[in-house]
Amino acid sequence: MIKFYNRKTKSYEIEKISGEKLLNWLYNSKNINFLDIVTKKKFFSYIYGQYCDSKLSTLKIKSFVNNFNIDMNESLKSIGEFNSFNDFFTRKLKSNSRTIYGNKNILISPADSKVLAFENIDINKIIQVKGSNYSFKELLNSDKLCEQYKNGSCIIFRLCPTDYHRFHFIDSGICTKTNKINGYYYSVNPIALEKIPSLFCKNKREWSILKSNNFGDILYMEVGATCVGTIVQTYTANKEVSKGQEKGYFKFGGSTVILFFEKNKVSIDKDILMQSNLGYETKVLIGDKIGKKFCSK
């Protein structure tokens, strides 16, 4: 059971998990050998990815929408217009379905997701979940940027399979080319995060730097997960991007976007920080205010 905070209703809710029974079974220590087959072998994600790209996979769209109460009024396409399950999964939304804060000093969410956020981070001991940490060096597979983000802020956006799976730029600026790091395909669900130490450092991931106009150099990292054989970047490197513009998308599966900010660049909203310190994620949508530009008093 995963409990998260809904800041609109100011109450806790229980997340409805796609494949919950399978996840609990896979991440039980007794099944670790089978888990390795699923997560450490590319063929599993490849085969399932091929199925999700096929016309046959459209048969599961309607039941998925009904089971998880997905609002198709937000989608540019109707259920019958999708060519595959991945076509549905990577669907685009109508422009009026999300509000992007235009104020340049407002920090927004890049994705529909559940959020954990931490300020003044120890780059050698970044929190994955309570009781489980990893280092910035492990995550990037390099130590060249460690000093730049020392004592900065880290925000983790976990996208579950039922979420809209495109991610966006949180500010205008210029984004560098994408750096790819090979890895496994563990689930990023909290069930898995509690069982697999330094999970984010083991999965397939990509990172880039958004040289933003208002929040300094923002390190963007996208982490793949079970059945996500592909992270697709749709932006053009080293060209001007705008706030709210699409950066890319994940194909089928849960996945994560992690943002790192330099010290004294952002102030994260207090309710998100409080819930994170209590161990609860906070639900957000693309464009939601999650903080503001740092201002010294």
Swiss-Prot record:
Membrane-protein topology: Peripheral membrane protein
Top EC class for this record: lyase
Cofactor note: Binds 1 pyruvoyl group covalently per subunit.
Subcellular localization(s) per the UniProt record: Cell membrane
EC number(s) stated in the UniProt entry for this protein: 4.1.1.65
Keyword list, A-Z: Cell membrane, Decarboxylase, Lipid biosynthesis, Lipid metabolism, Lyase, Membrane, Phospholipid biosynthesis, Phospholipid metabolism, Pyruvate, Zymogen
Matches recorded under InterPro entries: PS_Dcarbxylase, PSD-B, PSD_type2_pro
Superkingdom classification of source: Bacteria
GO molecular function: phosphatidylserine decarboxylase activity
Pathway as given in its UniProt record: Phospholipid metabolism; phosphatidylethanolamine biosynthesis; phosphatidylethanolamine from CDP-diacylglycerol: step 2/2
Site description Cleavage (non-hydrolytic), residues in chain: G254, S255
GO biological process: phosphatidylethanolamine biosynthetic process
Swiss-Prot/TrEMBL cofactor(s): pyruvate
CC terms in the record's Gene Ontology section: plasma membrane
Membrane-spanning segments: none
Major place of residence: membrane
Function: Catalyzes the formation of phosphatidylethanolamine (PtdEtn) from phosphatidylserine (PtdSer).
Family to which the UniProt record says this protein belongs: Belongs to the phosphatidylserine decarboxylase family. PSD-B subfamily. Prokaryotic type II sub-subfamily.
Protein name: Phosphatidylserine decarboxylase proenzyme
Species annotation: Clostridium tetani (strain Massachusetts / E88)
Gene: psd
